[in-house]
Amino acid sequence: MSGHSKWHSIRRTKSVLDQRRGQLFTKLARDITIATREGGSGDPEANFRLRLAVDKARAANMPMENIQRAIDRGLGKGGSDAAAIEEIYYEGYAPGGVALLIEAATDNRNRTASDVRATMTKNGGSPGEPGSVSWMFETKGLITIDLSVKRLDPDEVMLIAIDAGAEDVQIDDDIVEVYTDFKQLAAVRQHLIAAGLPVTGAEKTMIAKTTVQPDTADALKAMKLIEKLEDLDDVQKVYSNLDITSELAEQFVQG
């Protein structure tokens, strides 16, 4: 899972630097609305998916009134049209045979599908049929621990995470990524918090069963395509089976 971890870390850094605040808030609001509707409750204590979405929004300094408005939309209050927003996945390939699973939240399937296809085609990718790559991924839980918030021995943190039920632990400088069975995400998260670890995020993720390492040129093109897709307003996340070296990751960040 090391290649995924490195790419995930690079994307986290670049998204903070590149993504417009307004666009970020729109994506976070859609997450909250869908979580509220799917979980059947506007109370984060009773709706774990909503709690994760709200925590993520707060971490991005999203105003509380925006968060509440998104929750109200999910509850159908004030004549809002939460039912119009649906979660949908698109599939395809980036240069180098890199598989892409694209998660979107949209109120217009035709618009989103058109935007995704156009972006992929323009950047050397190829759209795929439903099921063409989704079988390559597994749903997992991802918990992020930031050791710059509280200095702890990384090896000790790893042992605590494994004892809590983690399936894999990746350490990249001060960031520790803990991967879990998705159904155990809430329990593992609570265990880590109770152990005093500085948990800064928890979310659903999709992990590739196997990864690919294309040559440098194709890897850079694949990363650029993923970045372009994630810049689309309706796209929430893009999962891939891309594996890259630390050197290539740095090259991409530096542009």
UniProtKB/Swiss-Prot annotation:
Signal peptide: none annotated. It comes from the Bacteria. One of its GO terms (cellular component) is cytosol. One of its GO terms (molecular function) is DNA binding. Its main location: cytoplasm. InterPro entries: Integrase-like_N, TACO1_YebC-like_2nd/3rd_dom, TACO1_YebC_N, Transcrip_reg_TACO1-like, Transcrip_reg_TACO1-like_dom3, YebC-like. GO terms for biological process: regulation of DNA-templated transcription. It is found in: Cytoplasm. Keywords: Cytoplasm, DNA-binding, Transcription, Transcription regulation. NCBIfam families: PRK00110.1 (NF001030), PRK12378.1 (NF009044), YebC/PmpR family DNA-binding transcriptional regulator (TIGR01033). Belongs to the TACO1 family. This is Probable transcriptional regulatory protein RoseRS_4362. It comes from Roseiflexus sp. (strain RS-1).
